[in-house]
Amino acid sequence: MAKKQSILSPIIRITFTFLVLCGLVYPLIVTGIAQAVMKDNADGSLIYNDKNEVIGSKLIGQNFTDPRYFHGRVSSIEYKAEASGSNNYAPSNPDLEKRVEKSIEEWKKQNPSVPVTEVPIDLVTNSGSGLDPDISPKAASVQVERISKITNIPKETLNQLIKEQTEGAALGLFGENRVNVLKLNLELQKLLK
């Protein structure tokens, strides 16, 4: 019995030690460093309104349906963050074709003056997460005519807004130019007031 107890004692001590180190000490150190070095990212890259209320995150897309605003990518999960993911249909899957055709039909209703051949792919396909907050500058530009017509904001002003909100590739190498739809719409909202 004493031999069994001598084997169990170090196992229990090591388990408890690693439980405290990995479950308490390490997360606290990492959180502390993140809060000190990159507080905005550590807090979720939140976006606040003029009243200092959280209205979203620059990392998670939102569903904009009002025709006065720029619209983001299609989301198969309706932008519900707790259900992140998409259907990830294969290109040969007929359901993908139906979903894309439905997106194109909705596009044509909202933007009748823009030929379907000019619709960027990111406006009719969803991202892998279904929560993509960004669209391409071209995807924003093809919406200018609709927004200008409804809001009476000159196209030049809207195009300048897109240009100002366009972010380049990460480190100049990774990814493509992109526009955060929430941030773009917040700037547009200032013009609508």
From Swiss-Prot:
Pfam families: KdpC (PF02669). It is found in: Cell membrane. One of its GO terms (cellular component) is plasma membrane. The keyword RNA-binding does not apply. The chain crosses the membrane at residues 14-34. Keywords: ATP-binding, Cell membrane, Ion transport, Membrane, Nucleotide-binding, Potassium, Potassium transport, Transmembrane, Transmembrane helix, Transport. InterPro entries: KdpC (IPR003820). One of its GO terms (molecular function) is ATP binding. It is a single-pass membrane protein. Belongs to the KdpC family. Part of the high-affinity ATP-driven potassium transport (or Kdp) system, which catalyzes the hydrolysis of ATP coupled with the electrogenic transport of potassium into the cytoplasm. This subunit acts as a catalytic chaperone that increases the ATP-binding affinity of the ATP-hydrolyzing subunit KdpB by the formation of a transient KdpB/KdpC/ATP ternary complex. The system is composed of three essential subunits: KdpA, KdpB and KdpC. This is Potassium-transporting ATPase KdpC subunit.
